[in-house]
């Protein structure tokens, strides 16, 4: 398979730059593989495609403000995009700068005196060390929500809420699990009223999700890694669904 096999025209005017007023107002494309048909619906119609025997599995990862701006000792500007936290004070990150910083270099975050130390580099990722009180606390005051590259606007206050699912709980993602963004509390309540079972897992979406495929032969593409956790209860319920021949969505 070649990368060119998947290329198609997508006019920029069709890429929404801001979310709809209500989550459920997003558009929904319904593909019927058996009938070979495509329908365009609203996400509020999603419930009509569910059955009481279904199991819905949601990703409860929570997006952190993972984009930072700073400068090197030389004065050069630096942009940091966290890939994933490896401890409370260390993280893998992508760095954009005119010249890549070397191990031992200090990056001072913009509008503060917060020093971030470069511990090392492996491929396109740098290992960074943040000072106390740790990455989460520093991100809350210094970081920005890392909007996808196809969003051609500056971050807004609304993004902290709308670029987050309503069931987000476990901090660690640098990008939202986008399919989950369209669910709101009333829809989740309606799912429960229909007797449809729900389960949770955690998969921290990494910055690699923004990286384009660099090779022409798709089979040679190296996928990035992401941290995940599947609770034993969720695994058991998924297995029970499969055993009974029921759907897991």
Each language-model region and where it sits:
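Surface-exposed, charge/polar-rich loops and edge strands
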Residues: 1-249
